[in-house]
Swiss-Prot record:
One of its GO terms (biological process) is killing of cells of another organism. This is Cytotoxin 8. Residues 1-21 form the signal peptide. It is found in: Secreted; Target cell membrane. It comes from Naja atra (Chinese cobra). The keyword Disulfide bond applies.
């Protein structure tokens, strides 16, 4: 009984994500990646002239300001970009 309980505890610890890790979409290949420590935002960058076609996606620490040519959209939930 103790062995079974210990096994369940170990499996639970291994399966749980003890520290929150953000997952953001990448552009190429279309997949997600786990963000490193300190990068707590997902971002999507696209040209203002073609707002439906993202140019870059990934993890970032601070959302950059958009300009006349480039727009950034940032968010803080898994795969939100």
């Amino acid at each position: 009984m103790k062995t079974l309980l210990l096994t369940l505890v170990v499996v639970t610890i291994v399966c749980l994500d003890l520290g929150y890790t953000l997952k953001c979409n990448k552009l190429i290949p279309i997949a997600s990646k786990t963000c490193p420590a300190g990068k707590n935002l997902c971002y999507k960058m696209f040209m203002v002239a073609t707002p439906k076609v993202p140019v870059k996606r990934g993890c970032i620490d601070v959302c950059p300001k958009s300009s006349l040519l480039v727009k950034y959209v940032c968010c803080n939930t898994d795969r939100c970009n």
